[in-house]
């Protein structure tokens, strides 16, 4: 397997999908954007545009497990979304445990100066995507081209 240089991280949701970018050379992930979704279905043209722009070597999709580590209803949907990403775009897709990333993202937003308005109007999904991608980068240094 070729070493990975650039990855996208995705915090999958039914209404919003957070996107982050991470680079092997820095070992860091940062928030990128939030895509709207309808019942978990994104605007696939916008997903295609992100893939065309960033040309990721792989995508990491957050897997929302229950606190005891068992799959949740959303886990199955996130896995299905992962398979669709792979099938549509031919990019390698990994999943990563994302327990508590949204909670942590809300805390990070508060630390940055607080939440302005509702989370629907000012979402934390891209922050959550960066957190889950950072976790994956930290756990898989052997796959990175550094």
Swiss-Prot record:
Gene3D superfamilies: YqgF/RNase H-like domain (3.30.420.140). GO terms for molecular function: nuclease activity. Keywords: Cytoplasm, Hydrolase, Nuclease, Ribosome biogenesis. CDD domains: YqgF. Its EC number is 3.1.-.-. GO terms for cellular component: cytosol. GO terms for biological process: rRNA 5'-end processing. It is found in: Cytoplasm. Belongs to the YqgF nuclease family. Could be a nuclease involved in processing of the 5'-end of pre-16S rRNA. NCBIfam families: RNAse_H_YqgF (TIGR00250). This is Putative pre-16S rRNA nuclease. It comes from Pseudomonas syringae pv. tomato (strain ATCC BAA-871 / DC3000).
